[in-house]
């Protein structure tokens, strides 16, 4: 299998989260690995969290399994059950359909780096957020009452 040259894959901190939910992830820099490498059956992202950055809002996926492998630094995993420190080599897994909102927060003074792996677009049927008035579907972001946010979702 060919080695991936990360320097050849665009790194971005774009988010589709509507304001004010977008602020916490401004220090999240990621590279989408699947499109430039030809992967079609799952998605993968190489993610760098700057100090104080969040990986996302606390969320779950209805149709997509998710796995994370910490490869540098450390971060705090926040889930419904509480907080857990993840360090190099630690793995976290969230089965699809389990409404256990999760995200990482980098509370250290150094960058942390992880790889996130999911089912990809064909399994992206939506999900929700534990702490805020936000749901996601393939075609956008919505309030829990069903009204649409004026924001472009970036899966």
Placement of each model-derived feature along the sequence:
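A short, N-terminal "cap"/entry segment at the start of jelly-roll beta-barrel domains
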Residues: 1-41, 127-155
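Conserved short histidine dyad/triad with adjacent acidic residue
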Residues: 30-32, 45-61, 99
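Active-site donor-binding loop signature of nucleotide-sugar glycosyltransferases
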Residues: 35, 51, 88, 119
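Ligand-binding loop in jelly-roll beta-barrel domains
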Residues: 38, 96-123
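Short, conserved beta-strand element in jelly-roll/cupin
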Residues: 46-50, 61-77, 117-120
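Short, charged/polar surface micro-motifs in flexible loops or helix N-caps
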Residues: 50-54, 74, 83, 98-99, ...
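Short hydrophobic/aromatic patches on the structural cores and recognition surfaces of FHA
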Residues: 73, 89, 104
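Short acidic-glycine-tyrosine-enriched beta hairpin
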Residues: 81-96
């Amino acid at each position: 299998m060919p080695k991936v040259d990360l320097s050849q894959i665009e790194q971005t901190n774009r988010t589709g989260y509507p304001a004010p939910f977008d602020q916490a992830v401004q220090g999240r820099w990621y590279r989408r690995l699947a499109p430039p490498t030809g992967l079609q059956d799952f998605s993968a992202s190489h993610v760098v969290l700057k100090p104080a950055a969040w990986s996302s809002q606390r969320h779950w996926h209805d149709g997509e399994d998710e796995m994370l492998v910490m490869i540098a630094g450390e971060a705090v995993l926040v889930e419904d059950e509480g907080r857990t420190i993840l360090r190099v080599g630690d793995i976290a897994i969230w089965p699809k359909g389990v409404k256990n909102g999760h995200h990482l927060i980098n509370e250290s003074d150094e960058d942390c780096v992880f790889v996130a792996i999911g089912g990809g677009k064909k399994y992206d049927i939506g999900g929700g957020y534990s702490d805020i008035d936000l749901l996601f579907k393939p075609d956008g972001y919505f309030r829990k009452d069903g009204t649409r946010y004026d924001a472009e979702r970036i899966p």
